[in-house]
UniProtKB/Swiss-Prot annotation:
<dbReference type="GO" id="GO:0006412">
    <property type="term" value="P:translation"/>
</dbReference>
<protein>
    <recommendedName>
        <fullName>Large ribosomal subunit protein bL32</fullName>
    </recommendedName>
</protein>
<keyword id="KW-0689">Ribosomal protein</keyword>
<feature type="region of interest" description="Disordered">
    <location>
        <begin position="1"/>
        <end position="45"/>
    </location>
</feature>
<dbReference type="Pfam" id="PF01783">
    <property type="entry name" value="Ribosomal_L32p"/>
</dbReference>
<dbReference type="InterPro" id="IPR002677">
    <property type="entry name" value="Ribosomal_bL32"/>
</dbReference>
<comment type="similarity">
    <text>Belongs to the bacterial ribosomal protein bL32 family.</text>
</comment>
<feature type="compositionally biased region" description="Basic residues">
    <location>
        <begin position="1"/>
        <end position="16"/>
    </location>
</feature>
<keyword id="KW-0687">Ribonucleoprotein</keyword>
<dbReference type="GO" id="GO:0015934">
    <property type="term" value="C:large ribosomal subunit"/>
</dbReference>
<dbReference type="InterPro" id="IPR011332">
    <property type="entry name" value="Ribosomal_zn-bd"/>
</dbReference>
<dbReference type="InterPro" id="IPR044957">
    <property type="entry name" value="Ribosomal_bL32_bact"/>
</dbReference>
<dbReference type="GO" id="GO:0003735">
    <property type="term" value="F:structural constituent of ribosome"/>
</dbReference>
Length: 57
């Protein structure tokens, strides 16, 4: 089993963790038909995608 020779400093730990932060929330788009805000590449809550009704709710 691997065991480190010496303890990592707070600085090195922070540098390693600097890439772990979550990015901004998903991008949003506005539907052309209803003007409703929705996640990109997803249908709106009322069933429209790219201006067409894709599912009956």
């Amino acid at each position: 089993m691997a065991v480190q020779k010496s303890r990592k400093t707070r600085s090195k730990r922070g540098m390693r963790r600097s890439h772990d932060a979550l990015t901004a929330p998903a991008q949003l788009s506005v539907d052309a038909t209803s003007g409703e805000t929705h996640r990109r590449h997803h249908m709106t809550a009322d069933g429209f995608y790219r201006g067409k009704k894709v599912i009956e709710l």
